[in-house]
Amino acid sequence: GHLESSNDAYAIAKIAGIKMCQAYRKQYGFNAISLMPTNLYGPNDNFDHNSSHVLPALISKFHGSLEKSKHWVVKLWGDGSPKREFLHVDDLAEACHTCMQDYEGDEHINVGTGEDVTIKELAETIVDVVGYENDYEWDTTKPNGTPRKVLNVDKIKSLGWEPKISLREGIESTYEWYKAVSYTHLTLP
């Protein structure tokens, strides 16, 4: 399909990486494997809500607002309708191991859960995990981005790999890590 205009440079870089692996394989006989992971999250992520991806940004925003007054409202971009797929980094590590052991092909492999959630559902889960009790609202003057991003993961599943960490479990463990490393120094706008 067509590339999302807000993300086309990143998509082109991914395509270039796939082509490079294929060229190394053909020219040098190097068994390069190109993996295309979905949205990743987990320990050591970037939690700066101004520059991070949506999941760690939401953890940062809601956690950073726990001590605010009852009148504080967290503002979230868009309307919450876009759908995204998320994969915990530990599941990606297992997928890499599986592919190194069991894959000899030259086509790229999508790595994900094959399941998506709306950004609204993601926010509701994070609100519950963090224990945020104040209001939040959607700022529809901000962009939604691509309506839906979910990968076809049939190829990696045919190798016997399946993700083990549910989205909620992953958010819970990521939030525990986040609190343990004291990311409370991040400030809200």
Residue ranges and their predicted role:
Residues 15, 26, 62, 149-150:
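Hydrophobic alpha-helical segments, especially transmembrane helices
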Residues 15-22, 56-60, 93-94:
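Conserved active-site helix of classical SDR/Rossmann-fold NAD(P)-dependent CH-OH oxidoreductases
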Residues 40-42, 54-55, 92:
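Conserved sequence/active-site signature of Rossmann-fold short-chain dehydrogenase/reductase
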Residues 58, 64-186:
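C-terminal substrate-binding subdomain of Rossmann-fold SDR/epimerase-dehydratase oxidoreductases
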